[in-house]
């Protein structure tokens, strides 16, 4: 069974970022080859509205059969608010929490992000998973693209 990964906006932006492209591009190649199913949301689309055109195009190059598109709903908003209420992150990071909530609710295998401050961070990951368990949701694995590529792909 193919892995289903939820990507946040930082991963799309990482496609052209000199610091992250060496790990981001092989990940997108895996998606294009159908080795991975990518999950993204209308939140990602909203966050990309002011991005350069070439960044917006990254998502458009992915084959539709390798994509799951999801939308923000009341349950995702409620779960994101629980992360804030439980002090996993501050309220200014609500959209990061929405990404975590959407991935949790869609039962993604992994959330992939380059956001080390609010997402890919051991303390934050423990916090998100603590809230998930407290409210009856599954734990979620959170990684950077670097952890998902095969080094022979790089």
Regions found by a protein language model. Give the residues of each.
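Short, well-structured N-terminal submotif of metal-dependent ribonuclease cores
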Residues: 1-40, 47-61, 67, 85-91, ...
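Acidic, PIN/NYN-like endoribonuclease modules and their adjacent C-terminal/linker elements
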Residues: 2, 10, 18, 45-46, ...
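Short, charged/polar low-complexity linear motifs in solvent-exposed/disordered segments
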Residues: 31-32, 74-75, 96-97, 130, ...
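General small-molecule cofactor/ligand-binding pocket signal
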Residues: 39, 70, 141-143
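Residues at the C-termini of beta-strands that transition into short coil/loop
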Residues: 42, 73, 146
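Active-site neighborhoods of divalent-metal-dependent phosphate/nucleic-acid chemistry enzymes
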Residues: 69-127, 149
